[in-house]
Structure formats: C-alpha cells, structure tokens
Amino acid sequence: MALAKTIMIQGTSSHVGKSLLCTALCRIFKQDGFHVAPFKAQNMALNSYVTLTGGEIGRAQGAQAEAAGIAATVTMNPVLIKPKQDLNAQVVVLGKPLADMSARDYRANFLPKAVNLVGQCIEELRREFQVLVIEGAGSPAEINLKDRDIVNMRTAILADAPVILVADIDRGGVFASLVGTLELLEPHERQRVAGFIINKFRGDIELLKPGLEFLEQRTGKPVLGVIPYLHEHGIEQEDSVALEGNKNVSSGSEIDIAVVKLPRISNFTDFDLIGRVPGICLRFVCPGDPMGTPEAVILPGTKNTIEDLQYLKEKGTDQEIIELARKGIPVVGICGGYQMLGKMLYDPWGTEASLESITGLGLLDIETTFFKEKQTHRCKAKITCTELNWCGITNQEITGYEIHTGQVKLGREAKPLLQITQRSGNIVALPDGAVGNQGHIWGTHLHGLFDNKALLLSWVNSLRERKGLSRLTLAKLPDNREEKYDNLAEAVRHHLNMKQLHQMMGLGEGKP
C-alpha cells in the first residue's frame, strides 16, 4: 500500500493561523474524497482534547480530526507539553502524563526519544491514510531553539513533506517576515519550502500584487494564496494568544458574562459557543481588574488550581466573586474553577504545588484532594439536580470530557449536579459536580458542558429571565460544528491554488 502524501504548514511566528489552515485543509481533502488525517509532532498548549480512548492531545488536532471526519488518536499529537509553573511543564506522551520536566530536563532526557516516537507515529499514519496534513509550531527559524526543534523542519524531513510558509499580514511586516524566515533556514530546509500563504488579509488585493510579485521574484517560490481575515469562522482557537484583548467575543450587550482569566487558564474553548450566542457579551477579566456588574461569573479550568487560587487571593478577586455571589449573581466553576469554589483544597503529594492545603472561596460545601493519577475521559452524563431552577433538561443526555487530578468530596449542603453514565466507553453511575442550596452557584469537572446546546440555552434563558428579557430558541444559537468546518473550507478553497498544492504533494489531478 502506498504511503500517504504529505503537506506541512509552518509559520513565521505563533498565531499566524497555522491551526486554522490545517483544519481547513483537512476538511477540503475530506470533501475531495481523500482519507485524511492531521498531525503535529509536539504541541505546547493548555487547551487539550480527550480522545475516545481517554488519551490527551492538543485541542487543535482534535478539531482537525473532526474536520477530517475521523476519530482523533494519540498518534496525531504524540507529545503534548502543558505548562504547569513558570519553569516546569507536564509532558504528555501518547495521551498519558509521563512526568513534570523543566526545559533542560526535557532536552537532556527525553528529546532523543521524542524524535524516534515522532518518526514512528508519522509512519503509522502514512500507512493508514491517503493524505497527512502536518502542522508546525511557532517559527522554524528560532535560532536559539533550532537544535531542539522537533516540530518543524525535522518533522518535515521525517514525513518527506513539502512546506508551505504562512505569514500574518494583519500584524504588518509580512514580506520581511517571510523573506527573513527563509534566509535564516539552512539551505536544505530552504529547498523544502515549496511556497507561501499570506493570511488574514483585509483590503484591495490589487494593492498587494506588487508585493507578491517581489516576493516570488526574490525567493523563486510561489504564493499559493492570500486568505482574507475570517472574522466569524467560529472554530475554537487553541493558543492563549487568542485571548489577548478579547474583552467581548460577541456583539450586543444584553447579558454580561465575566470569565476570570486565570494565569494558567486551560480549555478556554469551553466558552466559545457562549460567546457567539446573540446578545451575550463575554469578557475575560484578569485578576485584579474590576469585575463590574455581570449577570454571571465563570471560573474556568486551570493547569494549576492552587497557584491560580493563590493569585486570585493576592489580587482580591476572590472577595469580589464572593460578594457577587452573596448578591445572588450566578457563579459557575469548571474543573479547577469548580474546585476553587469549595471550602478546602488539599495537595498531600505535591501534585499541583508545594503548598499542602489552601482555603477555597467557600461558595460550595465541597473539599478537593489532588492525587498523582490524572483522570482523562470522554463522558456521557445526565443532569440530576432538581435544585437548578434554570435547568429544564433534567435526565437528558449531555456529553463532555474530564481532565483532572483532583477528587471532590461533597458536604451536606451540596448536592451532585449530574451523574456520569458513560466514561471512556464504559457504563458507569458516578456523581459529579455540585450545586449550592440556592441553586445559583454550581460547578462540574466536565469540560465541554456548554457545547450541549439544550443546556446552554436553558442556562442563558435563565439569565435573560432574571433581567426581564425574552427567551431565545434553539434556532438562535450558532451553527453546528459540521457547518463551521464546511464554511471554513469553502472560504479557504476559494482563495487557495489547490491545483498547485496538489502538484506539490504529488497528488496529480487531486483525486483519490
């Protein structure tokens, strides 16, 4: 059986749109009849995705697999690095935590093994699929990191992939960044770059043409496309850079929801759908900044619950949240944020930090103990708590996923929010989450909760009713994932020379 054809998307820097373009290409190749898969050798992110087998990979590769119409596997992102403290990170290998390492430890003790692992995963995927869409990281020309960079040109060589270099014109300096990146590559790496894509363009393309002609003449490499700035693509963004300046991700301000932007916030994609509901203003508020007078507050997940809770207290944000809760403002906690809402958090094995215990916000009658083993599961569940006066979907099935080491014990004044009925494919009956006596403070370990449209609609409508606003219907909620992937593919296909891309990949006429 022939090995899969490959294409690799690299960038001149972080946040130029590599992940989104790879997602679009996965969908385009799927639409064209190819059996396609994504790949990224090593990902550094706090937004992770749980596979059907309970493995943890980068969120972007999970979305790319969805766009490709396949189930994500751990081979699609064999190494995931999750920053835990300023000089320390958890290294996840083939979906399971290996160890906490410093950058120096990683380089000395694991990097050679990682290179071999990447090669094995690429070979496995190339034998299974017809096309492999590979994503790089940051820039391939980071001189100080070049000797330990396994995710860019070293991956391209292992996969025998032509490289498309992408730059973000919206930030300015696009031609300097492309030419400069190319100049800093080794000669054999430069030869592997097959062409360029200019991303996030606004304005008249005619005004850009002299620059495109210069770029092609200077480098001898073609520009395959100029992709417009896609404002409303609706695809989850993995990089926390996406949160910079993101004070309002939805037009309109009937309902104001404040998400606390914890220093080590993880899986902020939990709130993507909320932010696109008509009439909702979703704000990410840094600890220490005024919370204002929101209709609801959300404490999100975090890679280090104890240290982020300490930071909240140092900035006084804990007292602000407590005061809002006392006024009857709904407060929701997801995973680490849920644990923060409790009375006490214990870390006897130093899983999270050197601090053995810390008091929580005391808004829920729960206590959390952190253990060494991490729970990662795809789940099905049912809301069981009748004290939730906003919830009209009791006993309806919802889906989500768990990524946590903390185990929560409920006190007398808290009731379970839901019951997990399926965990990593196994039938179970496990309580999760907690609801306070008055019903407006609640939390859960389940990420992805607000991706369940019926639940989201019920919660949003409860906020609207408190303010005397009319209820929304399901028809008012954003498009589903499949439509988003199709729309993204259509937008990118229209501005990309797919025929030229097929030729670079050796796909001939671009048909299976």
Curated annotation (Swiss-Prot):
Keyword Oxidoreductase included in the entry's annotation: no
Domain of life: Bacteria
CDD domains reported for this sequence: CobQ_N (cd05389), GATase1_CobQ (cd01750)
Keyword RNA-binding in record: no
UniProtKB keywords: Cobalamin biosynthesis, Glutamine amidotransferase
Residues annotated as the enzyme's active site: C335 (nucleophile), H447
Domain GATase cobBQ-type: 254-455
Cysteines joined through disulfide linkages: none
Pathway connected to this protein: Cofactor biosynthesis; adenosylcobalamin biosynthesis
One term of GO molecular function: ABC-type vitamin B12 transporter activity
GO biological process: cobalamin biosynthetic process
Coiled coil (residue ranges): none
NCBIfam families linked to this entry: cobQ, PRK00784.1
General function of this protein: Catalyzes amidations at positions B, D, E, and G on adenosylcobyrinic A,C-diamide. NH(2) groups are provided by glutamine, and one molecule of ATP is hydrogenolyzed for each amidation.
Entry's family note: Belongs to the CobB/CobQ family. CobQ subfamily.
Protein's recorded name: Cobyric acid synthase
